[in-house]
Amino acid sequence: MNTNHIRQVVIVGGTHGNERIGLYLVKKFNQDSSLLFRPNLTTNCLIGNPQACKENQRYIETDLNRCFIKADLDNHLLGRHEEKQAKVLHEQLGPKGNSENFLLDLHSTTANMGLTLILVNDHPFNLHLAAYLTHHNPQVRVYRWTQENQENAFVSSLCQLGFAIEVGPIPQGILLASLFKETETLIHQTLDYLEQVNRGASPPLPKTLTLFQHLEVVDYPKTSNGELAGMIHPQLQGRDYQPLNPGDPIFLTFEDQTLFYEGCSTVWPIFINEAAYYEKGIAMCLTHKQDISLK
């Protein structure tokens, strides 16, 4: 069991301005800090992109959650709104990769992701906490977005300890009470765990953790001019975290032609048909489901 002492917990909402659950949870906690009180834990909440939240837009000029590459944080010539805001957050929460703070970044998605923890590293502390949360709520899934030899650019990468919470499905720009409450419960369960760690206790954990390891992203079918040529197949829509086998339908073209998954092994797609990913050329992320032993 990793015995890190957590100096402070930072909860970030509104990294994307049209994801309102995180924003309004942060506002709720800031209005009544006693909701987060734990005797051995200091917790602070902040809004990641206040201007985007004010305008109810994902971002002003570029995606804040892709602005945390270290070279970009050190490059003061980068002057777009979110690039500047990333530097502000880095000054508050950095240096990047520190292990003193624990960071929770709150997100929501139009995809049928349920309750998902997104890990951006293999730190044992994060894996243990993820196992604790999945043990207390089997509906929670764990997605590990790590790629070999590629630095992560997410807000949550500012700290070694922590992760993003992604909940859905929910349309952009609105609140859903059920997902709001489920996210709030996850936050409280996380703080309960961290409080135990700071007291020197070792919360009981399962011996294994099921996680979904990132493999690759898949784009939509496109024309030779780069225009959209199809959409998610009806048989795949909403089936996040369900197995996709070679030969299964994956896309339907505008001419009603079914395109089939041509991979050589079973994968588990997630973020299927996420609205914000159209501009990124991402129809879904493919993952591999695996059980890992906890040390």
From Swiss-Prot:
Cofactor: Zn(2+)
Gene Ontology molecular function: aspartoacylase activity; hydrolase activity, acting on ester bonds; zinc ion binding
Co-factor binding details: Binds 1 zinc ion per subunit.
TM helices/strands, residue ranges: none
Alphabetical list of InterPro entries matching this protein: AspA/AstE_fam (IPR050178), Aspartoacylase (IPR016708), AstE_AspA_cat (IPR055438), Aste_AspA_hybrid_dom (IPR007036)
Keyword Metal-binding: yes
One Pfam family recorded for the sequence: AstE_AspA_hybrid
EC number of this enzyme: 3.5.1.15
A Gene Ontology term for the protein's cellular component: cytosol
Keyword Transcription among record annotations: no
Binding residues for substrate: R58, N65, R66, E166, Y277
Keywords linked to the UniProt accession: Hydrolase, Metal-binding, Zinc
Binding residues annotated for Zn(2+), in chain numbering: H16, E19, H107
Reaction(s) catalysed (UniProt annotation): an N-acyl-L-aspartate + H2O = a carboxylate + L-aspartate
Signal sequence bounds: none
HAMAP family given in the database record: Aspartoacylase
Family from the record: Belongs to the AspA/AstE family. Aspartoacylase subfamily.
Name of the protein in question: Probable aspartoacylase
Organism of this sequence: Acaryochloris marina (strain MBIC 11017)
